[in-house]
Amino acid sequence: MRILITNDDGINAPGLEVLEGIARDLAGPDGEVWTVAPAFEQSGVSHAISYTHPMMIAKLAPRRYAAEGSPADCVLAALYDVLQGARPDLVLSGVNRGNNSAENVLYSGTVGGALEAALQGLPAIALSQFLGPETEGLADPFEGARTHGARIVRLLLEKGLWDDGDYRLFYNVNFPPKPAAGVRGQRVAAQGFRRDTSFGVEPHMSPSGRRFLWIRGGAQHSPTLPGTDAAVNLDGYISITPMRADLTAHDRLAELEALIG
C-alpha cells in the first residue's frame, strides 16, 4: 500500500510523527509512506490553495518533503510532482493538535487536506486529537490517536463507504480528550455546532503604540447536540463523520424553488 500523509501543524509537529507511525503500520514492510507537509504552521487555512504565488518545496529525507503552502497545496504537490505520477492508495491528514469537530471543520487545514485528496478521487481521512484536562498530564497527549489510529483507519478501509461521485466521500475522525485506556470505542456521528464558540477579535496595543488584533475562538468543550461529533468525543468515543465538499442545502432546494423559481 502506498500512503500519502500531510497535516496543517507543519512538518515538525508531533502529531505528524504520530501519523507517520500509523501510516507505517498500515502500509506494512512492503508498502510506502510519503510525507508532504507544510514547512510552516498552517492551522486555520481550511481548503486554501496558493495559486497566486509559487510554492517552494524541499526534500528533507527519502519520501519526506516540506512545502511552503497549505495542506491542500501539499496534496497537489505530492500528486503532480513528488510522486511522479504514481497514485497513493490512501491519503491521511493529521494528526491535528486539537479537535476538528463541529464548526472547527470549516476552518481546519487538516480537513482541507483530506478534502483536496477526495476531490482528486482518492480515499482520504482527516485525523485529530481532541485535547483537554485529562490529556494535559500525559507524557504523550496524542496517545489516544497513537494507540487507536491504525485500527480506526483499517476499520474504515474494510467496512467504510467509499463512493466515487463528483464530490467523493471522505472521513473526519476525532479522538476523544481521554487517555488511550479511557477510549470507550467509536461512534458514527454528524458534524455538530457549538453555539457559543464563534470566532471574534481581541484588540491590543503594541509597545510602539500600534493597534493590533488577535483572533480568538470560544470554549472547545461547550456542548453540542447529543450524538454529534464533539458530544461523542466528550463522552469518551472516537467520532467518525462521513463528509463531502458539496455545501448545497439539498433539503431546502425544492422549498426555495417553490418560493422564487
Swiss-Prot record:
Domain of life: Bacteria
Main location: cytoplasm
Enzyme Commission (EC) number: 3.1.3.5
Keyword ATP-binding: no
Cofactor(s) the protein requires to work: a divalent metal cation
Cofactor, free-text remark: Binds 1 divalent metal cation per subunit.
Catalytic reactions of this protein: a ribonucleoside 5'-phosphate + H2O = a ribonucleoside + phosphate
PANTHER family: 5'-NUCLEOTIDASE SURE, 5'_3'-NUCLEOTIDASE SURE
Task performed by this protein: Nucleotidase that shows phosphatase activity on nucleoside 5'-monophosphates.
Protein name: 5'-nucleotidase SurE
